[in-house]
Amino acid sequence: MIGRLSGVLLEKNPPQLLVDCNGVGYEVNVPMSTFYNLPGLGEKVALLTHLTVREDAHILFGFGTAEERNVFKQLVKITGIGARTALSILSGMSVADLSNAITLQEAGRLTKIPGIGKKTAERLLLELKGKLGADLGAAGGVIHSDATSDILNALLALGYSDKEALLAMKQVPAGTGVSDGIKLALKALSKA
């Protein structure tokens, strides 16, 4: 397996790159979030990669962060979600946004991504619930655990919007229990 590429960026044609690694040019497909953060042509670039082997091709997918690569790996494990669809999902929303959509069970946010219909969105919510939290907590500044889900559900039940609830969750330290988390979140909301 090829886990990382480091070399000179020769071409950028979204979503594909050509990276020269000591005289060998690797074609790498990247999500748009990674693409927008690339250096200019002729500059050094380092990407974490995932190699997909098919009967007719070996395809490299590159990522700017370990979180993106981990989420990609989780996505391709889901029945009906191929590597191209997983790349489209990561191009359509950030890792933190995807985590929050999964935590809040918001299929509507997922269906806004091209190629993701209602059934696919519901499958994503079902398959990823509880799997992404540990990987993505640091990415979005919000903890993601069973306690988080309970706290978020409590805030939503009290009539706060998704946005307000997520902003309040940023004030709740990781590992906080449900009752203390609700108190801290409500305190943060009262100050807003």
Curated annotation (Swiss-Prot):
Keywords recorded for this protein, A-Z: Cytoplasm, DNA damage, DNA recombination, DNA repair, DNA-binding
Entry's family note: Belongs to the RuvA family.
Major localisation: cytoplasm
One Pfam family this sequence matches: RuvA_N
Positions of the UniProt region annotated as Flexible linker: 139-142
Keyword DNA-binding among UniProt keywords: yes
Cystine residue pairs: none
Biological process according to GO: DNA recombination; DNA repair
Protein name listed in UniProt: Holliday junction branch migration complex subunit RuvA
InterPro entries recorded: DNA_helicase_Holl-junc_RuvA_I, Hlx-hairpin-Hlx_DNA-bd_motif, NA-bd_OB-fold, RuvA, RuvA_2-like, RuvA_C, RuvA_C_sf
Keyword DNA repair belongs to the record: yes
Gene3D superfamilies: 5' to 3' exonuclease, C-terminal subdomain, DNA helicase RuvA subunit, C-terminal domain, Nucleic acid-binding proteins
GO molecular function terms noted in the UniProt entry: ATP binding; four-way junction DNA binding; four-way junction helicase activity
Functional note: The RuvA-RuvB-RuvC complex processes Holliday junction (HJ) DNA during genetic recombination and DNA repair, while the RuvA-RuvB complex plays an important role in the rescue of blocked DNA replication forks via replication fork reversal (RFR). RuvA specifically binds to HJ cruciform DNA, conferring on it an open structure. The RuvB hexamer acts as an ATP-dependent pump, pulling dsDNA into and through the RuvAB complex. HJ branch migration allows RuvC to scan DNA until it finds its consensus sequence, where it cleaves and resolves the cruciform DNA.
Chain spans, region Domain II: 65-139
Gene: ruvA
Record's subunit section: Homotetramer. Forms an RuvA(8)-RuvB(12)-Holliday junction (HJ) complex. HJ DNA is sandwiched between 2 RuvA tetramers; dsDNA enters through RuvA and exits via RuvB. An RuvB hexamer assembles on each DNA strand where it exits the tetramer. Each RuvB hexamer is contacted by two RuvA subunits (via domain III) on 2 adjacent RuvB subunits; this complex drives branch migration. In the full resolvosome a probable DNA-RuvA(4)-RuvB(12)-RuvC(2) complex forms which resolves the HJ.
